[in-house]
A protein has these predicted regions:
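Helix-loop-helix connectors at the membrane interface of multi-pass transporters/channels
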Residues: 26, 52-73, 105, 162-169, ...
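A generic transmembrane alpha-helix motif of multi-pass inner-membrane proteins
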Residues: 302-303, 333-405
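Helix-loop-helix junctions that connect adjacent transmembrane segments
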Residues: 68, 97-227
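TM-loop-TM module centered on a large, flexible mid-protein loop between adjacent transmembrane helices
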Residues: 23, 30, 62, 175-241, ...
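Hydrophobic transmembrane alpha-helices that form the core helical bundles
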Residues: 1-85, 90, 231-251, 291-309
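C-terminal membrane-solvent junction of multi-pass transporters and transport-like membrane proteins
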Residues: 94, 261-271, 307-357, 381, ...
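Membrane-interface loop-to-helix entry segments
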Residues: 69-122, 176-181, 299-309, 334, ...
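Alpha-helical transmembrane segments of multipass membrane proteins
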Residues: 59, 81-85, 110, 191-192, ...
Length: 405
């Protein structure tokens, strides 16, 4: 992830505009490849609320086993869909408080895990190579990494804040790397602590393992606090994710990327894209038939595809500008070797996703290619622009009109 984060950081210097992977690939490689990246990003957005609702339902099912999982899933979907239709937004200060609460929950989890291990197995048990080696060898670790990469996603979204940031060519690259590093440290620390307590590879309910472990190390009271904190975070995240994808669909409908009659309409009463919100809720019902690992893999397919092309866009930028004045200071090690490693790792992890994710992802890409051919009249005209950043009225900030972003 750090190799890929470095590529995002590098491209944000050369293209200090909002748009992230879509913009980088379009400008450095090709507008049609940029469209494909935007298409895969749409898959991520469509499945993100589903994954969030599914994880929340898994925690609640573990806490209340007598209540079927589908009840929690439907409750999440109906509640967030209704709130998004009326246009409820969570204030920035509330988001900050919720984020701080989740950090507190994770910090307490690690603390209780350390106390548990020392009390039951001695201080020496805190140092173990098992969390990094596992029982199934490198192949099993790689397969797990292909799913765990979901926990590192987010650094790529920093570049969408470019136009709102002071001195973006200096601060955005630093922020991208910092988010990747901090997210990585938090994930590795919590995962290490959890694996010390639960070193096995077979569990009664893998989806609620963290909550079950919280009960083991801290008792029922801490488990309730742990689940409560995570559920609040899951609920607000699901609310934001559903709002984001519905507004993304609206922007794409408004710009002619998707059928305007359905996707490009706002409610006269609430000024929200009701059809898109309901569609997202209906897609979320797929959580009734999926587990966390499989649904997360769907998101990672789109992420790994975009990551690979962003890494290649760095190499493309180097090849295009190496003989120009702008490319006089470009270092082949940082513009070829580093992104090439990132691309190879991303492709390798992509191949480690489960077959269902690969099949869905390949089908989605095939649909995107066919749709691109239709929109461009057989590649004879440029693909339409995708608006992937927020504004104050529709949730997406509009830039100058262009054939592509």
């Amino acid at each position: 992830m750090l190799f890929t984060a470095a590529s995002y950081a590098r491209m944000s210097v050369h293209y200090p505009v909002a748009g992230s992977s879509y913009t980088y690939v379009r400008k450095a490689l090709d507008s049609r490849l940029g469209f494909i990246v935007g298409w895969t990003i749409l898959l991520d957005y469509l499945f993100l609320p589903l994954v969030i609702w599914l994880i929340g339902a898994a925690y609640l099912t573990g806490e209340f086993p007598s209540v079927p999982s589908w009840v929690w899933i439907v409750l999440f979907i109906v509640t967030t869909t209704a709130l998004n239709i009326v246009g409820l937004k969570v204030a920035d200060k509330a988001n900050f408080v919720l984020m701080a609460m989740q950090f507190l929950v994770l910090a307490l989890f690690v603390l209780f895990a350390v106390v548990y291990m020392v009390s039951n197995h001695g201080g020496g048990s805190l140092l173990s190579a098992n969390p990094f080696t596992g029982e199934g060898g490198f192949s099993a670790i790689a397969s797990g990494a292909a799913i765990a990469a979901y926990s590192f996603l987010g650094f790529d979204a920093v570049s969408t804040l470019t136009e709102d940031t002071k001195d973006p060519q200096r601060n955005i690259p630093r922020a991208i790397m910092l988010v990747a590093l901090v997210g990585g440290v938090v994930f590795v620390t919590v995962a290490y602590a959890l694996t010390l307590v639960e070193p096995g590879s077979t569990f009664d309910n893998a989806d609620s393992l963290a909550a079950d472990t919280a009960r083991t190390i801290g008792g029922s009271l801490f488990a309730a606090f742990f689940v409560g904190g995570l559920i609040i975070g899951q609920f607000t995240s699901g609310l934001a994710a559903q709002a984001s994808v519905s507004r993304l669909q609206f922007a794409m409908g408004r710009d002619g990327v998707l059928p305007k009659g359905f996707f490009g309409r706002l409610s006269d009463r609430f000024a929200t894209p009701i059809f898109n919100i309901v569609l997202c809720g209906l897609i979320g019902l797929g959580a009734l038939f999926l587990d966390v690992a499989t649904s997360t893999s769907f998101i990672n397919f789109g992420a790994f595809t975009a990551f690979t092309l962003v890494n290649l866009s760095v190499i493309g930028y180097f090849m295009r500008h190496r003989d120009t004045a702008a490319g006089s200071g470009l270092n082949p090690a940082t513009y070829v070797v580093v992104p090439l490693i990132g691309a190879l790792v991303d492709v390798y992890l992509l191949t480690k996703l489960d077959s269902a994710a690969l099949m869905l992802g390949a089908s989605w890409l095939a649909i995107g290619v066919v749709y691109l051919l239709v929109l461009t009249r057989g590649l004879r005209v440029p693909p339409p622009e995708m608006s992937l950043v927020e504004d104050d009225t529709t949730g997406f900030r509009q830039g100058p009109a262009r054939s592509q972003e």
